[in-house]
């Protein structure tokens, strides 16, 4: 494992993922409200268009696919070998995306969205916009769900792509 490369790849994909998701959250704000804390989600629900939610999920899945492909291809070309090393490379890189999500989307984007009154219709006066309330949902997600469930899945996908590429090339 090449730690400096893991850090740089993790940071690069963290920026790509989080700024990509952040950008589209301003294009389809009502759809993105479905991923916010419960109070905001419920307040915004009458204004959410199902077609926009489908677009949002297509965008997010496309961004995830690009991230996983980059991780797998980059790991393959870095010369990392062995399933354990490939897995941990993908895991650590996705951990960077996770913490970037916490800082960029859950802290920075929340503050920007909160200050743009009317961006998410119906949720303008929700208590869940306050940092403490928001973090009640964000911290368990980023300190438990991502490291225990999602990062290992990312590690498996990264290892799978790199192993597949090693058999092809």
Please provide the spans of the model-predicted regions.
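Membrane-interface helix-loop junction between the first two transmembrane segments
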Residues: 23-45
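Interfacial helix-start motif at the membrane-water boundary
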Residues: 44-64
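Hydrophobic alpha-helical transmembrane segments
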Residues: 58, 133-152
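Short, membrane-exposed interhelical loops at transmembrane-helix boundaries
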Residues: 118-140
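Hydrophobic alpha-helical membrane-embedded segments
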Residues: 8-30, 93-112
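Juxtamembrane boundary at the C-terminal end of a transmembrane helix
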Residues: 156-169
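Juxtamembrane non-transmembrane "cap" segments at the membrane-aqueous interface
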Residues: 104-126
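Residue-level signature of transmembrane alpha-helical entry/exit and packing/kink sites
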Residues: 5-10, 82-90, 143, 147
């Amino acid at each position: 494992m090449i730690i400096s490369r893991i850090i740089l790849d993790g940071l690069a994909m963290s920026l790509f993922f989080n700024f990509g998701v952040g950008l589209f959250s301003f294009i389809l704000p009502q759809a993105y409200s479905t991923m916010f804390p419960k109070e905001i989600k419920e307040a915004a629900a009458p204004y959410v268009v199902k077609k926009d939610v489908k677009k949002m999920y297509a965008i997010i899945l496309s961004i995830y696919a690009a991230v996983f492909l980059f991780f797998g291809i980059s790991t393959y070309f870095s010369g990392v070998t062995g399933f354990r090393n490939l897995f941990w490379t993908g895991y650590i890189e996705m951990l960077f995306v996770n913490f970037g999500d916490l800082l960029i989307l859950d802290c920075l984007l929340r503050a920007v969205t909160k200050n743009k009154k009317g961006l998410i219709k119906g949720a303008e006066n929700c208590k869940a916009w306050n940092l403490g309330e928001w973090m009640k949902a964000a911290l368990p997600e980023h300190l438990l769900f991502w490291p225990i469930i999602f990062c290992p899945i990312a590690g498996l996908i990264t290892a799978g792509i790199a192993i597949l590429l090693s058999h092809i090339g």
